[in-house]
Amino acid sequence: MRAWAFLVLLAAPAVAGTLHKGEIVERLASNVDPSVTYAYYVPEAYTPERQWPVLFVFDPRSRGAMAAELFREAAEEFGWIVVSSNDTRSDGPVEPNARAINGMWPDVHDRFAIAPKRIYATGFSGGAILAFSLAETTNAVAGVISVGGRHDDVARIDNVSFDWFGTAGNTDFNYLETREIEDRLKELDAQWRFESFPGRHRWAPKDLLRRSIEWMEVQAMKRGLRPVDKALVRRALE
């Protein structure tokens, strides 16, 4: 998937506007393409005077609010913005997903005060493929959280500049494919982590998704993208 039209990836200053804090807003239309909508969550402490990590969420059935809810508590705890597409699909043509990304990406940069080096992407199933593709093709994504995903051609994965947290149910039909990504990242000496959970092909439980965010926080410390928090590191290693 290579149909990204927004390749000028410099972060723009946030446009002044009313954002609802501490609650999931189910539908926000993009100013770039009003046919594209997404759900969002910003922490209670959000202020445009500082920059915040942002997580792009891609559900394979366009369930933006539902998918955002899975990350809401972790986003509040760690101070992340969540933006979750209402348009991404799986098992279909590329064009709807390309339109969703091309409408979301610049709009999110305009509306929210985001940290340009702390942009993350996650997805489930086909949404995980989309998240990985976005990271591969833009070099603008710091980390990918892949849930029950696969890769179209694992052998072609190369020069991975982002951190990867993979997870899948132990009876998920994409379980082995997710582990193949893990094996390839090991070969490339990339930064990775994999955790399974009991279950079939579905989004991971909230507590596991929270750990994925926590792990990304630790990786950000290693990369000098945020101050070191020794207490957080200790909790993450427990």
Model-derived segments and spans:
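A domain-start/cap signature at the N-terminus of enzymes
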Residues: 14-52, 126, 133
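Gly/Ser-rich "nucleophile elbow"/oxyanion-hole loop immediately N-terminal to the catalytic nucleophile
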Residues: 44-51, 93-125
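Short beta-strand element of the alpha/beta-hydrolase
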Residues: 50-61
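Short amphipathic alpha-helix adjacent to the substrate-entry channel of hydrolases
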Residues: 66-83
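Primarily recognizes the serine-hydrolase "nucleophile elbow" in alpha/beta-hydrolase
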Residues: 67, 109-111, 117-162
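Short beta-strand/loop motif that positions the catalytic acidic residue
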Residues: 165-168
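Acidic catalytic loop of the alpha/beta-hydrolase fold
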Residues: 170-176, 202
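C-terminal catalytic histidine-bearing segment of alpha/beta-hydrolase fold enzymes
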Residues: 179-182, 186-238
